[in-house]
Design a protein with these regions (language model features):
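Hydrophobic alpha-helical targeting segments used for export or membrane insertion
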Residues: 2-11
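Helix-start (N-cap) detector for alpha-helical repeat units in TPR-like alpha-solenoids
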Residues: 12-14, 47-48, 81-82, 97, ...
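Alpha-helical segment of the N-proximal tetratricopeptide repeat
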Residues: 12-42, 52-55, 59, 89, ...
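Structural signature of tandem alpha-helical TPR/SEL1-like repeats
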Residues: 25-35, 57-72, 94-106, 128-140, ...
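Structural marker of alpha-solenoid helical repeat scaffolds
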Residues: 42, 76, 110, 144-148, ...
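TPR/TPR-like (Sel1-like) alpha-helical repeat modules
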Residues: 198, 211-218, 224, 228-257
Length: 259
């Protein structure tokens, strides 16, 4: 009977964790919190559960809890690529770029074929003003994510946006084009493409890209940003009625955001 009790105790936290993962994937956050807490009550050093609790805490705007869970996870298992990666992401999102670098580099070493640690390192070096290193890392991230997918599209959008900031407009547009091929539902990709085409004077093709962006879910790029861009594009296309309509929508969206 002792071995049966031991087996039940061992399986218990794993079952709670698996249920928490399912709830998290289905965006049932209160249920996921309950399950992950149950897993950690039975197994306080369960690294995957600590990482999941940290991610849930981030959604709940509890950075103190997220940081504590991730540091506990790394203390329990310094070789956890997932824990190192999410600690780096945590610091990146807190704009603490110097602290983000070390765990992201560790995650990259632990999982050299994963594009995500390299991608976040690229954005971190970009934020710190190290353009040369950022360019190299963005290219590495792109090379590690060759398949057309929403993940590769996100990498290409960020890469293209960085190239745009460096004045490499044609290269930027090419990244945006490939991002759209990878994820036609990416609002950010269509917006960045519209912005690039507008800069290059291709207003006729920029307008439909901006209009397409407006039809997609608002995750990163806001409605206000797109309306402002389209207002300027339609002015250049000598379509004042459309320009005026988008300008009014830009003002309305901006007021809504400020409330």
């Amino acid at each position: 009977m002792i071995w049966l009790l031991a087996l039940q105790l061992a399986v218990g936290p794993a079952q709670h964790y698996e249920k928490a993962k399912q709830d998290f994937a289905q965006r049932k956050f209160p249920e996921a919190v309950s399950e992950v807490n149950a897993a950690l009550h039975e197994s306080p050093d369960m690294v995957p559960a600590l990482v999941l609790k940290a991610r849930l805490a981030t959604f709940a705007h509890r950075p103190d809890v997220a940081k504590s869970c991730l540091i506990t996870a790394i203390t329990a298992d310094p070789t956890s690529e997932e824990a190192q990666f999410f600690l780096g992401v945590f610091y990146y999102n807190q704009n603490d770029f110097k602290l983000a670098t070390s765990p992201l580099q560790t995650a990259q070493t632990l999982s050299p074929k994963s594009p995500l640690p390299v991608f976040y390192l690229a954005m971190t070096h970009e934020a710190m003003g190290d353009a040369t290193q950022a360019l190299d890392l963005y290219q590495q991230a792109e090379n590690l994510s060759p398949e057309k997918s929403p993940q590769s599209a996100s990498i290409l959008v960020a890469y293209g946006r960085f190239l745009f900031s460096l004045g490499r407009y044609k290269d930027s547009i090419e990244k945006d084009r490939r991002a759209i091929e990878g994820d036609a539902e990416s609002r950010d990709a269509h917006y960045e493409m519209a912005k690039g085409l507008d800069h290059e004077g291709d207003f006729k093709n920029a307008a439909p890209e901006g209009e397409r962006a407006l039809t997609l879910p608002e995750l990163g790029t806001s409605d206000a940003q797109i309306h402002f861009l389209l207002a300027n594009i339609y002015l250049k296309l000598k379509q004042p009625d459309l320009a005026k309509a988008h300008l009014e929508k830009f003002k309305a969206a901006s007021q809504t955001t400020r409330r």
